[in-house]
Each structure stands twice: as structure tokens, then as C-alpha cells.
């Protein structure tokens, strides 16, 4: 047997090394940048998952929360300052019903990542401060006139929300509160009429 030349031996070694390197590369492929990006995108949890909500829903919840705070604080004022039993009872009902609705709305908003107002804005605070300066029949009449106007507006907004909004939870909230708002309006109209009758008899 002839001894292979040094050149032939070097060639064989080179082929073997190349083949071995190719095998290792096949077993451990280097991830390309697109692959790495796709993996991270697939594995990263979406912050919006389960919390995404439209601007219309966000606007409705924010305004409903502010309106609810107005009703509760106005009701507390009426329960304390009203002269007529009908007005005092109406104020107490506002505290009870809108207080519960406010808590329900907070839970819905929290689950969707929406921050609701926790206190009155300057405009509504000013309205209640002016109302608080009244007393007796003047307070009763002014408060009930505001309540009739507010509940008519609330009903229109909640009807629109129940019809047009896309989010099922917010839509259901609006729809479920309509019967109570309509009852409040009937009560407000009756109490407002009573305050006018009393004023007419003075």
C-alpha cells in the first residue's frame, strides 16, 4: 500500500472538517433577525388583550361617572336641606341608586383599564355650591328643576349608548340603568310639580 502524500492527506482533512461543520450548523441553525422578532412578538403578552375599548365607550363611562357623582352629592344636599318631604325622599333615593350604579361602573371601568373621575370637576362643583346657598322653597324648586333636566339628558345619553356602543359590558350597563333613570324622571317631575304648587300658594 502506498503512503498517501501530504497534499492528499490535507485535502481529506479539509473535506472532513467542512462536512463536520455543516452537520453542526444543520443541528443548531442560527436564528435570523426576523425569526427572533417573530418569536418575541408571539410570546409577549398583549397589554391590550381584554382591555381594549373604544373612545365612545370611554367617553360615555367618564360622563356617566361624573353625572353619578353629581346625583349622589346633590342628593346628599337635598336630604339635608330640602323642606318638602317629597324632595328630601328624592334626594335620599338619588344617593342610594346612583351610589350603587357608580360602584358598578367603577368595576367595569377597572376591568377595561379606564380611569374614571373620582370627584366633581370645577363646573359641577360650582353648580352644587350655588345650589347649597339656597334654602327652603327656593332650594326645593331649583333642585327639582335641575333633576328633571338632568334625568331627561341622562335618559337620552343612556339610550344612545345602549343602542350604539360596541363593548358588551358597557352597553349592558347603559341598558340596565334605563328603567331606573326613567323612574327617577317620573319622581322628579312629580316633586317638581309639587314645589311649584307650594310656591303658587304662598
Regions found by a protein language model. Name each.
Residues 2-12, 22-202:
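His/Met- and acidic-residue-enriched segments that coordinate or traffic transition-metal cofactors
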Amino acid at each position: 500500500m502506498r503512503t498517501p502524500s501530504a497534499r492528499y492527506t490535507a485535502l481529506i482533512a479539509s473535506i472532513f472538517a467542512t462536512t463536520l461543520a455543516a452537520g453542526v450548523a444543520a443541528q443548531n441553525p442560527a436564528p435570523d433577525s426576523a425569526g427572533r422578532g417573530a418569536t418575541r412578538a408571539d410570546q409577549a403578552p398583549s397589554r391590550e388583550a381584554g382591555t381594549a375599548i373604544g373612545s365612545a365607550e370611554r367617553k360615555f363611562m367618564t360622563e356617566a361617572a361624573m353625572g353619578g357623582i353629581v346625583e349622589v352629592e346633590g342628593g346628599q344636599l337635598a336630604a339635608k336641606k330640602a323642606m318638602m318631604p317629597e324632595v328630601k325622599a328624592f334626594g335620599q333615593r338619588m344617593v342610594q341608586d346612583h351610589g350603587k350604579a357608580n360602584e358598578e361602573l367603577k368595576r367595569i371601568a377597572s376591568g377595561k383599564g379606564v380611569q374614571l373621575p373620582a370627584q366633581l370637576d370645577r363646573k359641577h362643583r360650582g353648580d352644587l355650591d350655588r345650589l347649597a346657598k339656597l334654602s327652603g322653597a327656593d332650594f326645593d324648586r331649583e333642585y327639582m328643576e335641575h333633576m328633571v333636566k338632568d334625568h331627561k339628558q341622562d335618559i337620552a345619553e343612556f339610550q344612545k349608548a345602549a343602542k350604539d356602543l360596541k363593548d358588551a359590558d358597557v352597553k349592558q350597563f347603559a341598558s340596565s340603568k334605563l328603567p331606573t333613570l326613567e323612574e327617577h324622571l317620573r319622581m322628579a317631575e312629580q316633586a317638581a310639580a309639587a314645589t311649584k304648587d307650594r310656591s303658587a300658594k304662598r
